[in-house]
């Protein structure tokens, strides 16, 4: 599979995850759903930037889990990692009820900081 087809496939998987997670958020407020969507979008950008790291040998990934996964399973580990991370984030947020907006806001802030940092050092999202 070519890199462009892989990215297209992973985008479709993320869109499906967004839709499924938002459908199952029956007891969630509009704010909760919006924060989850923002988190998913930021994680998608972070995933694409992380994939860009492995196309440029002058960069390196700071996350040891992703590095070990790529070393053992190849570049397809990156999207799998982010899909699992998003799923885990949804499962945790679903259990938090009153703390949900705080949790989702915190994870969004962390993801935004990573995306901004990656952008500043020159990583692209491959669009």
Model-predicted segments: where are they?
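Hydrophobic alpha-helical membrane segments
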Residues: 26-127
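Sec-dependent N-terminal signal peptides
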Residues: 13-22
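Bacterial N-terminal signal peptides that target proteins for export
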Residues: 3-14
